[in-house]
From Swiss-Prot:
UniProt keyword Isomerase, yes or no: yes
Keywords, ordered alphabetically: Carbohydrate metabolism, Cytoplasm, Isomerase
Name of this protein: D-ribose pyranase
Uppermost EC category: isomerase
GO biological process, one term: D-ribose catabolic process
Reaction catalysis annotation: beta-D-ribopyranose = beta-D-ribofuranose
Subcellular location: Cytoplasm
Name of encoding gene: rbsD
Family matches, as SUPFAM superfamilies: RbsD-like
Annotated GO CC locations: cytosol
EC number: 5.4.99.62
Naturally occurring in which organism (per UniProt): Bacillus cereus (strain G9842)
Length: 131
């Protein structure tokens, strides 16, 4: 049995398979998930698990080079935006329109769906390298 890092076998497998610049999305419960993209659904009820809880666990286990967010989060969910900026201080940040964000999700290796039910609580994590 694994005792450190991500315990969810689907998430652990996705993270282990990532190459440089591959992407993983952590999403609220309302983000549309495109056909053909792996869905890892963690939502058990509204708010559980939270977006920030899942982000923290994944970020602790992943080399992240860049973060993409919908620009709408800045005004419509400033608290989540602030928390993301505080948790992920090393990667570069990119803000795009929500429509562009949804287009980018079509290229993700996986989308991890949380129980989060606040606006624009979604992030695209771009894999970096560990060397």
């Amino acid at each position: 049995m694994k005792k450190h890092g991500v315990l969810n076998s689907e998430i652990a497998a996705v993270l282990a398979s990532l190459g440089h610049t591959d992407t993983v999305v952590i999403a609220d419960c309302g983000l549309p998930i495109p056909d053909g993209v792996k869905r890892i659904d963690l939502a058990v009820e509204i708010g559980k698990p939270s977006f920030l809880e899942v982000l923290q666990v994944v970020a602790d286990d992943m080399a992240i080079e860049k973060v993409t967010l919908a620009e709408e989060v800045i005004i419509n969910n400033a608290e989540v935006n602030k928390e993301i900026e505080q948790k992920l201080i090393e990667p570069a940040f990119e803000y795009v329109s929500h429509e562009q964000f949804k287009e980018h999700t079509k290229k993700a290796k996986a989308i991890i769906r949380t129980g989060e039910a606040t606006p624009y609580a979604n992030v695209i994590l771009h894999a970096g390298v560990i060397f």
